[in-house]
Amino acid sequence: MAEITSQMVMQLREKTQVGVLDCKKALAEAEGDLEKAIELLRKKGIMKAGKVKDKVATEGLVGSYIHTGGRIGVLVEVNCQTDFVAKGEEFQQLVRDIAMQIAASPNVEFVSVDDVDQEVKDRELAIEVQREDLLSKPEKIRAQIAQGRVDKLFKERALLEQPFIKDQSISVGELITQKIAKIGENIKVRRFARFVLGEGLEKEEKNFAEEVAAQTGSV
């Protein structure tokens, strides 16, 4: 597997105006071939999406989803650039899909890994570095393993990193990128809230035998 250097990533970024992470993924998939990486970005619609991702998105929808039985509910705000797009079926279906995704993702806490404060990341890294299974390893190796674990931890909690429930071959972030390329406007998930019935409440625990006895009048 070809080594992907920061210089290669920046070169691809300059040519395509695509984000660093997408450039790195494309280069890895293309085994370091710049032209193949550009072609991959084109095929995935990422190049087209990259041109509008920095544009301000202040329109959109607040979508909701209530799971069958009414035990789980979701509210999510998804922004786009124009009211015209917000009223379109393509965008509205995307919002519904994202709300359903959040309902099905109990571990998700934030939209993107970028939303996590560096202080929180540093604190988790400090904890991981001191794990007992790493203490015997060389400092450099220990730091690399710890960083990998922390990255994995936050990715598991980020909405955009989750495999899309309707197509596990892409992430939620990649789904949104595809929609940006198709619709031609910037789209961003701004915030969300997930509600679970009874979450945080302490249920009264009863002795089953005593409860039955009380109901039958034998106590």
Swiss-Prot record:
The chain's coiled-coil residues are none
Major location, coarse class? cytoplasm
The alphabetized UniProt keywords are:
Cytoplasm, Elongation factor, Protein biosynthesis
SUPFAM superfamilies, sorted: Elongation factor Ts (EF-Ts), dimerisation domain, UBA-like
Query: Region labeled Involved in Mg(2+) ion dislocation from EF-Tu — which residues?
Result: 82-85
Q: Which domain of life is it from?
A: Bacteria
- CDD domains documented for this protein: UBA_EF-Ts (cd14275)
* Compartment(s) where it occurs, according to its Swiss-Prot or TrEMBL record: Cytoplasm
In terms of InterPro entries, this protein maps to: EF-Ts_dimer_sf, Transl_elong_EFTs/EF1B, Transl_elong_EFTs/EF1B_dimer, Transl_elong_Ts_CS, UBA-like_sf
The GO cellular component terms are:
cytoplasm
Database matches in Pfam families: EF_TS
Leader sequence segment: none
A molecular function (GO) term: translation elongation factor activity
Protein function:
Associates with the EF-Tu.GDP complex and induces the exchange of GDP to GTP. It remains bound to the aminoacyl-tRNA.EF-Tu.GTP complex up to the GTP hydrolysis stage on the ribosome.
Name the family the entry cites. Belongs to the EF-Ts family.
HAMAP family, per this entry?
EF_Ts (MF_00050)
Q: Which protein is depicted?
A: Elongation factor Ts
Q: Gene name?
A: tsf
